[in-house]
Amino acid sequence: MAQQGPNPIEVYESVVKALMPVMAGVTAAQLNSTTPCTEWTVQSLINHALAVQVFGTSVLSKTSPDMASMGNVDHALPSEGAEAAFKSITDTTLATLKSANLEVTVKTSFGEMPGGNFIMIPITDMIIHKWDLAKATGQSATIDNALAELGIQVLTPAVAGGREGGFFGPEVIVPASASAQDRLLGLSGRTP
Protein backbone atom coordinates (compact mmCIF):
# COMPACT_ATOMS: atom_id res chain seq x y z
CA MET A 1 0.00 0.00 0.00
CA ALA A 2 1.34 3.45 -0.90
CA GLN A 3 2.32 5.97 1.76
CA GLN A 4 -0.69 8.07 2.72
CA GLY A 5 -0.36 11.72 3.59
CA PRO A 6 2.52 14.12 3.13
CA ASN A 7 5.88 13.10 1.70
CA PRO A 8 7.97 12.06 4.75
CA ILE A 9 11.23 13.20 3.15
CA GLU A 10 9.91 16.69 2.39
CA VAL A 11 8.39 16.98 5.87
CA TYR A 12 11.64 15.81 7.49
CA GLU A 13 13.61 18.41 5.54
CA SER A 14 11.13 21.12 6.55
CA VAL A 15 11.28 20.26 10.25
CA VAL A 16 15.08 20.08 10.27
CA LYS A 17 15.18 23.47 8.53
CA ALA A 18 12.93 24.90 11.27
CA LEU A 19 14.93 23.39 14.15
CA MET A 20 18.46 24.07 12.85
CA PRO A 21 18.51 27.83 13.59
CA VAL A 22 17.14 27.17 17.08
CA MET A 23 19.99 24.71 17.72
CA ALA A 24 22.42 27.29 16.35
CA GLY A 25 20.98 29.95 18.64
CA VAL A 26 21.66 28.08 21.87
CA THR A 27 24.57 29.54 23.84
CA ALA A 28 26.86 27.71 26.26
CA ALA A 29 25.41 29.83 29.08
CA GLN A 30 21.94 28.39 28.36
CA LEU A 31 22.83 24.69 28.52
CA ASN A 32 21.84 24.32 32.18
CA SER A 33 18.61 26.33 31.76
CA THR A 34 15.28 24.66 32.44
CA THR A 35 12.93 23.72 29.62
CA PRO A 36 9.18 23.09 29.33
CA CYS A 37 10.22 19.41 29.64
CA THR A 38 10.65 19.88 33.37
CA GLU A 39 12.94 16.88 33.84
CA TRP A 40 15.42 18.14 31.22
CA THR A 41 17.80 21.04 30.89
CA VAL A 42 18.55 22.60 27.51
CA GLN A 43 21.58 20.30 27.23
CA SER A 44 19.49 17.22 28.06
CA LEU A 45 16.84 18.22 25.52
CA ILE A 46 19.47 18.64 22.80
CA ASN A 47 20.94 15.23 23.66
CA HIS A 48 17.44 13.75 23.42
CA ALA A 49 16.86 15.39 20.02
CA LEU A 50 20.11 13.88 18.76
CA ALA A 51 19.32 10.44 20.21
CA VAL A 52 15.85 10.35 18.63
CA GLN A 53 17.38 10.88 15.19
CA VAL A 54 19.95 8.13 15.80
CA PHE A 55 17.07 5.87 16.89
CA GLY A 56 15.05 6.76 13.77
CA THR A 57 17.98 6.03 11.50
CA SER A 58 18.53 2.68 13.23
CA VAL A 59 14.90 1.66 12.78
CA LEU A 60 14.84 2.64 9.11
CA SER A 61 18.15 0.93 8.36
CA LYS A 62 17.03 -2.13 10.32
CA THR A 63 20.02 -2.12 12.63
CA SER A 64 19.62 -2.53 16.37
CA PRO A 65 17.75 0.53 17.63
CA ASP A 66 18.18 1.35 21.29
CA MET A 67 15.00 2.94 22.64
CA ALA A 68 16.60 3.50 26.04
CA SER A 69 19.21 5.80 24.49
CA MET A 70 16.54 8.44 23.86
CA GLY A 71 16.18 8.92 27.60
CA ASN A 72 19.91 8.69 28.37
CA VAL A 73 20.49 12.42 28.08
CA ASP A 74 22.49 13.47 31.12
CA HIS A 75 25.89 13.78 29.47
CA ALA A 76 27.98 16.39 27.72
CA LEU A 77 27.06 17.50 24.23
CA PRO A 78 29.08 15.95 21.41
CA SER A 79 32.50 17.60 21.06
CA GLU A 80 31.56 19.16 17.70
CA GLY A 81 28.69 21.04 19.36
CA ALA A 82 24.91 20.81 19.15
CA GLU A 83 24.44 22.43 15.75
CA ALA A 84 27.14 20.39 13.99
CA ALA A 85 26.01 17.16 15.66
CA PHE A 86 22.38 17.83 14.74
CA LYS A 87 23.33 18.60 11.12
CA SER A 88 25.41 15.43 10.92
CA ILE A 89 22.76 13.08 12.33
CA THR A 90 19.88 14.65 10.39
CA ASP A 91 21.95 14.44 7.19
CA THR A 92 22.45 10.74 7.94
CA THR A 93 18.76 10.24 8.68
CA LEU A 94 17.80 12.09 5.51
CA ALA A 95 20.16 9.95 3.41
CA THR A 96 18.63 6.85 5.01
CA LEU A 97 15.12 8.14 4.25
CA LYS A 98 16.02 8.81 0.63
CA SER A 99 17.50 5.34 0.15
CA ALA A 100 14.81 3.41 2.03
CA ASN A 101 11.61 1.97 0.65
CA LEU A 102 9.30 3.79 3.04
CA GLU A 103 6.44 1.42 2.24
CA VAL A 104 8.32 -1.53 3.74
CA THR A 105 7.24 -2.46 7.25
CA VAL A 106 9.74 -1.78 10.01
CA LYS A 107 9.75 -3.17 13.53
CA THR A 108 9.62 -0.48 16.18
CA SER A 109 8.99 -0.28 19.88
CA PHE A 110 5.63 1.20 18.84
CA GLY A 111 4.73 -1.85 16.78
CA GLU A 112 5.20 -2.73 13.12
CA MET A 113 4.40 -0.04 10.56
CA PRO A 114 5.57 1.26 7.19
CA GLY A 115 8.81 3.22 7.45
CA GLY A 116 7.09 6.33 6.09
CA ASN A 117 4.60 6.21 8.95
CA PHE A 118 7.29 5.50 11.54
CA ILE A 119 9.45 8.51 10.63
CA MET A 120 6.50 10.77 11.44
CA ILE A 121 7.10 9.94 15.13
CA PRO A 122 10.65 11.38 15.23
CA ILE A 123 9.40 14.24 13.04
CA THR A 124 6.67 15.07 15.56
CA ASP A 125 9.23 14.82 18.36
CA MET A 126 11.30 17.48 16.57
CA ILE A 127 8.26 19.70 15.97
CA ILE A 128 7.37 19.73 19.66
CA HIS A 129 10.92 19.99 20.97
CA LYS A 130 11.69 22.87 18.62
CA TRP A 131 9.11 24.80 20.64
CA ASP A 132 10.55 23.56 23.95
CA LEU A 133 14.09 24.54 23.00
CA ALA A 134 13.06 27.91 21.59
CA LYS A 135 11.01 28.76 24.69
CA ALA A 136 13.87 27.76 26.99
CA THR A 137 16.40 29.88 25.12
CA GLY A 138 14.31 32.96 24.33
CA GLN A 139 14.04 32.31 20.60
CA SER A 140 11.03 32.39 18.29
CA ALA A 141 8.82 29.49 19.32
CA THR A 142 6.41 29.70 16.41
CA ILE A 143 5.56 26.35 14.84
CA ASP A 144 4.55 26.33 11.19
CA ASN A 145 0.79 25.76 11.00
CA ALA A 146 1.02 22.80 8.60
CA LEU A 147 3.64 21.14 10.82
CA ALA A 148 1.50 21.72 13.91
CA GLU A 149 -1.49 20.13 12.15
CA LEU A 150 0.69 17.18 11.16
CA GLY A 151 1.89 16.86 14.75
CA ILE A 152 -1.71 16.74 15.97
CA GLN A 153 -2.54 14.07 13.39
CA VAL A 154 0.43 11.91 14.43
CA LEU A 155 0.12 12.48 18.17
CA THR A 156 -3.64 12.07 18.63
CA PRO A 157 -3.81 8.27 18.26
CA ALA A 158 -0.61 7.76 20.28
CA VAL A 159 -0.89 10.27 23.10
CA ALA A 160 -2.79 8.06 25.58
CA GLY A 161 -0.07 5.42 25.44
CA GLY A 162 2.55 8.14 25.61
CA ARG A 163 1.00 9.50 28.79
CA GLU A 164 0.94 6.01 30.32
CA GLY A 165 4.63 5.66 29.44
CA GLY A 166 5.45 9.02 31.00
CA PHE A 167 6.34 10.68 27.69
CA PHE A 168 3.62 13.33 27.97
CA GLY A 169 1.99 15.15 30.84
CA PRO A 170 -1.77 15.53 31.20
CA GLU A 171 -3.46 17.35 28.35
CA VAL A 172 -3.67 21.11 28.79
CA ILE A 173 -7.14 22.10 27.60
CA VAL A 174 -7.14 24.94 25.10
CA PRO A 175 -10.15 26.59 23.44
CA ALA A 176 -11.55 24.85 20.36
CA SER A 177 -10.70 28.02 18.43
CA ALA A 178 -7.01 27.83 19.45
CA SER A 179 -4.29 27.77 16.81
CA ALA A 180 -2.92 24.44 15.61
CA GLN A 181 0.27 25.21 17.53
CA ASP A 182 -1.61 25.72 20.79
CA ARG A 183 -3.72 22.59 20.21
CA LEU A 184 -0.56 20.53 19.59
CA LEU A 185 1.13 21.95 22.67
CA GLY A 186 -1.92 21.32 24.84
CA LEU A 187 -2.28 17.79 23.50
CA SER A 188 1.36 17.11 24.35
CA GLY A 189 0.90 18.37 27.92
CA ARG A 190 2.41 21.81 27.44
CA THR A 191 0.92 25.15 28.39
CA PRO A 192 0.92 27.27 25.23
Annotate each predicted stretch with a short phrase.
Residues 48-49:
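Glycine-rich loop at the start of a catalytic domain that most often binds anionic cofactors/ligands
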